[in-house]
Amino acid sequence: FWHYPVLVLVGCIVGVINTMAGGGSLITLPILIFLGLPSNVANGTNRIGLLMTAFSANMGYRSKGILTSPFSTYVGLFALIGSLIGAQIAIDIDDKIFNKILSIIMIIVILVILFSPQILKGDLNERIKGKSLIVSCFVFFIIGMYGGFVNAGIGFIIMLFLNLYNRMNLIRVNATKSAVILIYTIGAFLTFLINDLVNFGYGLSLGFGTLFGCLLYTSDAADEEDSVDLG
């Protein structure tokens, strides 16, 4: 029984982390595996919290009129296609191999966080049409594959690409990130669900905590200064 309140508490922390930048799955996946779930079930269960985080973040940004469609829709759909492929790979892979890959990913993501370039500040000249849109759709297909496979640390990758390539400011980066993650996570979650790889008790406990943490952050997110240092 104690697993459930612990997961709610973990979810609160992860909700804030995911909405600010990402990387919450680096915490939740190992915890779910530690609690005894097979790696593929932990991966599928983790998607419930991700869905609730992305959904509540989207509602927060929408309530403040921060929208980045149709760009976020276009890249989100390409990410969705990629996520279906990535999720199926995660389902088919052996648990021991997945855990080794996850360990390597955790090290890489930590290094990215420590040594990533600083987010660009101020009013930027966005590049979200024409050739930039085509490149973005291709990149988000790859990002979606990774997100469908494991999702850990993907928020940092998305933030860096949207800011450094698409030249979005921090608030629009976070709004776009939340929309894209919501779109592709629906596909990944359904893939795990169809294969009966979701523990709803753990997932909902984590999800409700995540929802609270996410709302805690997004209530003030649109009023914060347009800068962040991912290092």
What name fits each language-model region?
Residues 92-106, 118-124, 197, 201, ...:
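Loop-to-transmembrane alpha-helix entry segments
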Residues 44, 48-97, 185-220:
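Selective hydrophobic functional segments
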Residues 9, 13, 52, 81, ...:
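Lipid-exposed faces of alpha-helical membrane segments in multi-pass integral membrane proteins
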Residues 217, 221-231:
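Single conserved hydrophobic/aromatic residue that forms the stacking wall/gate
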Residues 39-45, 70-71, 168-177:
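Membrane-interface alpha-helices at helix entry/exit sites of multi-pass transporters
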Residues 5, 44, 97-104, 134, ...:
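Alpha-helical transmembrane segments of integral membrane proteins
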Residues 1-38, 125-174, 204:
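Selected transmembrane alpha-helices and immediately adjacent juxtamembrane segments
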